[in-house]
Amino acid sequence: MGAEQICNLFKDKIMNVEKLGSIAILDGDKFSDKEINSRIICLPGKKSIEELFFEYSKDLFENDIKNFWQDSFLEDNGYTRVWYRDNILVSIEQIDETAKKSNKDKRKINKKIFNNENYFPFFNKVIDFWIKDEKNEKVLKSFIKDFITVTKQLLQFYGILYNKLIIEKEEQ
């Protein structure tokens, strides 16, 4: 189901998904669809999650960020700069051409590359590094704030007091 259909479902007065106790988390490029009151939030960034991390991985490559490339997991599994250049970067740079030639949706091609079983462990490390990157702190805090807001709404829907959960956790 696409973001547009999800938004329509969540905003539909007849379906009244708010009464179903659900939240929706969309890609960052769907930011205009964000509606906290309808429990719709967006992932950080103003792009699809795939494009965000394709771009970030290219930045890590082009700037030769040593503390990323020297990660023991990456080194132990052969995810070197050369491997990235010869495999993932080539795939990323061919997305527009592939979409044009195959008449496929660019978004689907992005997802296929991002979720490729050979690339996914690499992208997990890219995501981890992005989360820890101080440059992303502001956008992450905004997402976390939105996530907490919709989570509180969901807890309230189910009759669970958020403050009670915090107190119980602190007592453990």
Regions found by a protein language model. Give the residues of each.
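Acidic, Mg2+-coordinating catalytic modules of nucleic-acid enzymes
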Residues: 1-172
